[in-house]
């Protein structure tokens, strides 16, 4: 039976206004919209009155917006029938944890009530199209239609293909019907294989074969034989990549054979809890570094949010499934798309060439895609710390004559680093009889055919198949699975995981054969043991769907009880679906129909399928010299600063958590003005050391339109000039991931790909001592469509994205582009050696040209000399700032350095030649260093020692003030105020934020950037930062116990435990399942801390589901109430823990006036480094800190203080319960965005109880208790930041 429960309004006023504006723009006469959430409960039994009241209260959440009786035509938007939304999965979990077992499933829709003039049926269809994502949602016309969400179908049987009766044609028909993308020789192979077996193939077997052997999974082009211009080539593409490892195997522990590559890391203290006692401690051991970079281009073109989200999620699983289990740590994200054409902000180089109906626009991709990628990383608990963003779409004269080149099929890049134990780097042995397990969520009828679909050019496959290949994301589920993997690897030798793979393209049909085959075994499986939420699925759909957040594992039978215990504690679902067999054979039984959908020798599935041969021709690009007749430097500056590739990326950065883990030493945001210009990302290797890891990206795809090999060399060079900003040492410590995107089969591209791979794999990397142990290829970068009577194609440039990874010697020595105004000198290191080529530059692009000659690596020895010189200078602390030269050239390099330093620049470019335009806008490799004036001679001498004497040019200096002046022999070439340039550079991000977020907030942030008097972040302390007030208590040897409390989805518990540990506590890991199961009670603890993250993925309100699972469970409720009423206890709630505790007011004495914390005013997740002031309050944790102003990490989507009315706010203030407030850089309490990131009244961001024993706050002191983890800090801070005082206060209070 289905019950319908009304919810709160679903859209804020500005969202409704945006919708109305969209309708008006489309000539749809809609006058008013009201939207509210509607909940649908699928019940297996009636609820009694108290259960009904409980369910009603459970579904009351979010901001208190006024509901009213709706008027107008109803359009009900729900998830597509036959799918289960992530919201549903998590809300149902909460209901069950609150004891409501009669609820089989909760689902949520949005009821839109539309008041409009008379609209035609077609116009109503247009209105409905604006309100839902057709890939994931459907529109009903009545609330009762939602019953279709809960229809349970009978299981469908397997179907076979009559190969023996109909011959080869049966396979050809199945190939088209199922979208298998099989080549002719593969059809021949299958015909021969099944004829030999003497039986017809089942659809599931063909589908499994197609996925396992798709270009996406098998990389046929990279393993192919090559004939170019009639000459057979000696090596495959993959062999040339492997040449880099053969030449430089140094420091590589695993390459080419696992889900990620592994290199040597540093010996540090890895911090985690003991399995038996729950006590956190440091474990001194090597933390080896794993690295992986994936792409998820096809799904992102179809449905950007889930496409980008599952792209990030799949890459995170690759990291976790490395060796015998590993720990993902920090991520990177990248996007290449066609022109944005922002409405009202269209640029002169942006022409609309049309697009296929089934893919979305570049603007849609960059509005939704980055949010999806960021949301997954945020909710999983992985900081995203670097990335790139390129737009390109133009009609150009390239290798193949005049044609359209651009990114209608986008690049969505997702990558990152993690850590792994030395003894877990290699997979174990799968013993015969080992249990074969699927860890993670249930099978759902989604993502079917992703591997085969992404192997086709967009437009080749059927729209319904595109539709079927889109996946959905549930990062909180993946977090639970990762917690299980963490518990396993933390057991060391007792790790129950023998072998692990992630489930990606092709679902279990790819993952399980890969698992047993890689382990030298076969597998015997039972289909109906696979967890499934949709009983009507066919065997093919159960086995081959791409439901996300799943892993496949082999666990020895005697270790199963331990594995079961770990999964139950973390609430991570799993199923034993088979056993490993001696014989390398795959069998899948179906208990329901008592038949065998799969019965195949593994070598038929994964054996010697036909090898591809590429017989291709070379085409040379002629290019036309740049026409400079209408180009002035002043106009060029403004255009280039508006090009999204160059322009400010704040809209892509602040949506992503950059502080979770407490181990982020360098994020994108630089300096007191938090300008997103960092060259590389840096993390600490642990919470107790200064060793670390670095990541950078290099990418120069448009150059491939003129010179394939130069483009590839530049990508490597740029990654190197970016990562050189930190202290790495030997260049052989740097390892690269190469991600290759090409339109294979397009004239000239295949030979160009071969040239590019050869340039990097056979020449440049071996010469530099660089290794490429990991990478990926995407070979179908083309879209086709019909535009009127014309057939059109948009082909991407050959695109190599290089990600560089390295171990860092000392993270404190990392340079940024932030200029200093002390007596200084700016030096250009020009690795282009005066070539100053303008082909395929940002300058050329903004004038709709390509040019002829591009930049290139001019001298490999000098590039190596540059890196070595930088390392010597970084280690000697001789440099004040560094920024590489890339998109936009020297002018942009200097401008971004000035923005970061909030200062002026005075440089003279006479030494760079007479062609000032080329000097300022060429994109040759190199960069600008800033040195103290007194060190200039010594630095230049050192650079000369490394063979760079002819590359170094003194430019001028950074000065206090606002002028940005470029001269040549004292004649002004360009002069402008830095603030004006800063505003131009920011306009793209402003416009994107206005479109996507609350426009009022976007306007306030843009306005703040125009304020030249802004002093930036600053610190005012009322206490001695170096005093350890906990030292006398630590000296007693007593270590009070703090319960580090987490719920499923919480992700900030480890750094919280470390902060309390440093202050003299024994930090104990306590999961809510421990309390609910009665395994642990709070009676033994002196302190309790509820940690940050996304409990239940913030479903049913941030922290509210967690709170209600306490309030609605009598025993646990009593446990918390007793703790809060006990004298001599302390409690802290941070972020999600703050939101949760604010909902426990009825249990906490003196908290009656506490507010609720609801959706940010910007309507967006905000990750900021914000200035706060400690106010006078009873809080015991903030004693002695009153009046201090200091920056702190902020990462939340629901942090805005909500009070009932003005009287409530006045009472909260008059009782003195406000503990922290946001202040602006002038030290004034503020409600202005982004200084106040959530719009809380009076800047309130922390409150306490009347006795001061319980304090809750939205910002994260635990993420910045180490100075090195602060995005910016004064030079004189030592190991501990001022926020360490909170934890030491806690230790002092407990005596």
UniProtKB/Swiss-Prot annotation:
The keyword Cytoplasm applies. Disulfide bonds: none annotated. Changing residue 1181 to W: This mutant has the same secondary structure content and FGAM synthetase activity as the wild-type protein and exhibits almost no destabilization. The keyword Magnesium applies. ATP binds at residues 307-318, 386-388, 678, 886. Residues 1042-1295 form the Glutamine amidotransferase type-1 domain. It holds the Pfam family FGAR-AT_linker. PROSITE patterns: GATASE_TYPE_1. CDD domains: GATase1_FGAR_AT, PurL, PurL_repeat1. Its EC number is 6.3.5.3. Pathway: Purine metabolism; IMP biosynthesis via de novo pathway; 5-amino-1-(5-phospho-D-ribosyl)imidazole from N(2)-formyl-N(1)-(5-phospho-D-ribosyl)glycinamide: step 1/2. GO terms for molecular function: ATP binding; metal ion binding; phosphoribosylformylglycinamidine synthase activity. The active site is at 1135 (nucleophile), 1260, 1262. It comes from the Bacteria. Keywords: ATP-binding, Cytoplasm, Glutamine amidotransferase, Ligase, Magnesium, Metal-binding, Nucleotide-binding, Purine biosynthesis. It is found in: Cytoplasm. Monomer. In the N-terminal section; belongs to the FGAMS family. Phosphoribosylformylglycinamidine synthase involved in the purines biosynthetic pathway. Catalyzes the ATP-dependent conversion of formylglycinamide ribonucleotide (FGAR) and glutamine to yield formylglycinamidine ribonucleotide (FGAM) and glutamate. This is Phosphoribosylformylglycinamidine synthase. It comes from Salmonella typhimurium (strain LT2 / SGSC1412 / ATCC 700720). The gene is purL.
